[in-house]
């Protein structure tokens, strides 16, 4: 296979770095933890997340994005779950995205998907159901870690 020629010109060879934060939202339902999953406009299932605003901490961004994308309030931060990263191309440019996920708890059930941002559905699911729905392996691993954190918190308290 012939070697590809290097791109030249403005922005060639540069990777755009993006930092996001999101929430693994959990709610207690009759003694069982249920997790919030959202569906985007591409029909992919995952978690609420988005870019950090200027001067905003990752924790604050995670809480803001969860509230904006799902309509939930009464959100309680439980701490960092994991940081994942991935690469993708957008308009011909390579993007390296880093996303910090936090465990967030709520007592509220009713959600309101933010359709203007491409959120087409919100669902509360058990770990097993959420894990089966989630579209990406790295997000599934974050869910597993969040579930482990909830179990550790229950057994310790």
Locate each region found by the language model.
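Unchanged
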Residues: 52-141
């Amino acid at each position: 296979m012939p070697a590809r020629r290097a791109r030249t010109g403005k922005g060639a060879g540069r990777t755009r770095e993006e930092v996001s934060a999101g929430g693994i939202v959990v709610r207690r339902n009759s003694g069982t933890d249920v997790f919030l999953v959202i569906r985007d406009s591409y029909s992919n299932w995952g978690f609420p997340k988005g870019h950090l605003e200027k001067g905003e901490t990752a924790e604050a961004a995670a809480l803001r994005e969860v509230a904006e994308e799902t309509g939930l309030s009464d959100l309680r931060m439980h701490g960092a779950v994991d940081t994942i990263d991935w690469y993708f191309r957008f308009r011909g440019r390579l993007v390296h995205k880093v996303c910090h996920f936090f465990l967030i708890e709520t007592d509220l059930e009713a959600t309101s998907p933010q359709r203007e941002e491409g959120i087409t559905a919100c669902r509360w699911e058990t770990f097993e159901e959420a894990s089966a729905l989630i579209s990406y392996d790295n997000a599934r691993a974050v869910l597993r870690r969040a579930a482990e954190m909830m179990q550790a918190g229950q057994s310790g308290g």
